[in-house]
Amino acid sequence: MSDRRRLIALCLALCFSFICASPASTKDAERYRAVPANADGIGKAYMDRQIAHVMSFQGAAWLERNEREREERSDLLLGILSLASGSSVADVGAGTGYYARRFADLVGPTGTVYAVDVQPEMVAVLQAAAKRRGYEHIKPVLGTVRDITLPAGSVDVAIMVDVYHELEFPYEVLQSVVHSLKPGGRVVFVEYRAEDPRVPIKRLHKMSEAQIRLEAEQHALEWERTANELPWQHVVIFKRK
C-alpha cells in the first residue's frame, strides 16, 4: 500500500471511530476525571471526590455483624424515615438485606421493598435470607453500575445506606433513582460524617453534608432536611421536584 493510501485509510479510521464514539463514554470523560488510586479509592473522581472501592460480597458477614445495631442505631434511622404502611421503598445497594428487612417490617405486607444490588452473589444472599424469614414483599433486583433498573414512578422512598460514596457512576445511578420516584418521592442518603474526625471510618468512605447536597442538586432534587441523631452518620433527605 502506498503512503498516500495508508494516510487515507488512517484518516477514514479516525473519522469512523469519532463518529461511532459512545455518547456515554463522551459524557464520562466530561463528568469524571482520573486521580491517583489508593487502597481505598478507585482512581476516579466525581465533583472533586474520589470514589471509594465497593464492598465485595465476600464481606457480607460484616454487614450482619452483631455490633451494627449499636454502632448505627438502626432504630433511630427507622424513626427518622417514618416509612408508611403500604409504601414502596427502594433499598439501593441493599447488600445482604440488613436494612431491607427492617424497611419491610415498617411498610408491611401491603408495601414493597425493592432490594437493589449490582453483585449477583449479594442478590442471592439477600434473596435467600428474605425467603428464609418469610419476607414475600422484599423483591430482590439486580441493577447495573449505571442504573437501578426500576420502573419510572414506582417508588415512594429510595434509601442508600453507606452506599452512594462507592457508586462507580454516581451521576447515572442517582438519575435512575430520581426516574424511579413517584411525584414528590424522596431520596435518602445515609453516610458517615466526614465533618467529624471522631468517626472511625476511612476518609473515602465518609461524605460531608455539603458534598452530598452538591451532588444531589445536580438532579431534580430539593433538599428537605438533615438529621444528625445517629452516632456516626447523617441522614440527608431530598424531595423530587
Task: Locate the predicted segments by residue.
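Hydrophobic beta-strand segment of the Class I
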Residues: 89, 158-159
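A short acidic, Gly/Pro-enriched loop at the edge of an enzyme's catalytic core
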Residues: 146-157
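Conserved class I S-adenosyl-L-methionine
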Residues: 186-213
